[in-house]
Amino acid sequence: MGSGKVTFVALLLCLSVGVIAEDPYLYFNWNVTYGTIAPLGVPQQGILINGQFPGPRINCTSNNNIVVNVFNNLDEPFLFTWNGVQHRKNSWQDGTPGTMCPIMPGQNFTYRFQVKDQIGSYSYFPTTALHRAAGGYGALNVHSRALIPVPFDNPADEYNVFVGDWYNKGHKTLKKILDGGRTIGRPDGIIINGKSAKVGEAKEPLFTMEAGKTYRYRFCNLGMRSSVNIRFQGHPMKLVELEGSHTVQNIYDSLDLHVGQCLSVLVTADQEPKDYYLVVSSRFLKQALSSVAIIRYANGKGPASPELPTPPPENTEGIAWSMNQFRSFRWNLTASAARPNPQGSYHYGQINITRTIKIFNSMSQVGGKLRYGLNGISHTNGETPLKLVEYFGATNKAFKYDLMADEAPADPSKLTIATNVKNATYRNFVEIIFENHEKTIRTYHLDGYSFFAVAVEPGRWSPEKRKNYNLVDGLSRNNIQVYPNSWAAIMLTFDNAGMWNLRSEMWEKTYLGEQLYFSVLSPSRSLRDEYNIPDNHPLCGIVKGLSMPAPYKA
């Protein structure tokens, strides 16, 4: 063969390898509209995606590229966030008011992101206004690649279950209440996949199982404020995954699931073939709320028993029970996640802490209106997304960094309304302590990262409490609960450049200021660390019409 032919063949081989090596793309077109729904039997305006509530399920595989073209047919600006997706180098697609201009009514926007080096159970939902109270949410499941071993046999099927509290008031009414300075109060009920039912009501089954087979149930709590407890009538649950981590496979009769959290369990259909109830009940509310759904055996005979499994205790005893359950959630050190190497090959407990950030939540009246905040700052969104302001070098016109200190002020209950942006040094390993001095539970989520949940304890934190940390097999996750009059500790490396939202997952509190943004800048301004602004990214506010900055280079 001549040298020219050899060169040509070699070039073809290189090109074919390049094509094969690119990860697959999945494309979705979503039409976001209003529609009448009645989760608790009261007709109200809901937010539908392609006519569905809950919305369409995204089923993908680790490293897939996801392309979602969203058409906003509402009468208000709208955004989706992809809760738990890390968006490596790409906070442009995170879908929060601090990173993106909203999709205006009658307009569309195409999200493009990669589920890089992730597996697990996640969700998407609206971040604008109080839209989450009207629906607009759904599942985002990331499966392991074919060559990566999974620490359990393939289930017969997978089912996504969205649970949480619900309000009969519409999202615009709820927003008006908050804008008027009042709380939205107690929810009206609990829903399961957009519906509710009581024992004895004739309802279609939520899911069907075949006797002798095992099923994977992916649960997410996308309510507004209430923790819930999940239990199957007559069927124990084997916990196998929580927010992207394979867990030690303990067996549970019931599981607490806090707002914003997702987990996976295996349930085996090994009982008498008939109907059984899935029970979801509220936690830590003065007046308990609950709902049931029917799980039916194929070819089964007989209704579900009216005798429901006993819920866990409430009040102080219930908090201790739930805290102990948290401690039982541990990382499966020998299992692989998105990569072939075992999860336990990352020894987070041996890394030196470079910074400790203590965060106190509080509530207060500001100008006669209810506000929530962190370390004395109640966050407010400006007219321009923070990421755009920073990228265009216009921060002096929009916000000041580090108004919030790493320690709580002497009187954290005194709140100042301001844009809350903290600098974080790229690739530093940090410890974040959450202290909750309130009488109600909190849950917090950090975009762009998974962190190690090393402790949840009663009382107040002090450096001596580090001896209680789990430095070996704490779960890598993206959401942490903080019980009343308790604290929680997480550890992470700020190795993902971008602008990332730390927020309460209880949307009333988020809307009224209980959130902040971490600015994580790479000093090299290199494409190795962060992507340039996408070509289709809309500009708004003070950066609209400005010349584009010099792009990052490889």
Curated annotation (Swiss-Prot):
Keywords: Disulfide bond, Germination, Glycoprotein, Metal-binding, Oxidoreductase, Repeat, Secreted, Signal. GO terms for cellular component: extracellular region. The keyword Membrane does not apply. Its EC number is 1.10.3.-. GO terms for molecular function: copper ion binding; oxidoreductase activity. It comes from the Eukaryota. Glycans are attached at N31, N59, N108, N332, N352, N423. Disulfide bonds join C101-C540. Pollen. Induction: Expression regulated by the haploid gametophyte itself. The keyword Transmembrane helix does not apply. It is found in: Secreted, Extracellular space. Residues 1-21 form the signal peptide. Residues 22-143, 196-296, 411-521 form the Plastocyanin-like domain. CDD domains: CuRO_1_AAO_like_1 (cd13846), CuRO_2_AAO_like_1 (cd13872). Pfam families: Cu-oxidase, Cu-oxidase_2, Cu-oxidase_3. Belongs to the multicopper oxidase family. Probable oxidoreductase that may be involved in pollen tube growth. This is L-ascorbate oxidase homolog. It comes from Nicotiana tabacum.
